[in-house]
Amino acid sequence: MLTVKEKGILLYIIEHCQRIEEKIVGATRKTLDENKDVLEIICFNILQIGELAKKLETDFIKKHNKMPWSDIKGMRDIVAHGYGTINLDKVWKTASEEVKSLREYCESIIEENK
């Protein structure tokens, strides 16, 4: 059973994933070079996802270990402390390939714990 805190965190992670997914519809990797607003929105939501992941307890992470939670937290640190040196290829890969699986995994955890 999920705690209220865990469910809340997962719901917020899902929300931030959806924001990224909505923002990249019709976008390409090149969009990140050409549209700083899109880049900033994606990075902000990646940062928020990482912050939320850091609030998950060790027991939760051990139980729900099909997602690389430490990498998610690490990506937050890269975005937060990149100081203009963020690898845009990595940001694009995260946004276009990894965010959907994170959202689906979080949704499945909530569904399994109804």
Locations of regions flagged by a protein language model:
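Solvent-exposed interaction patches of small proteins and small membrane subunits
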Residues: 1-114
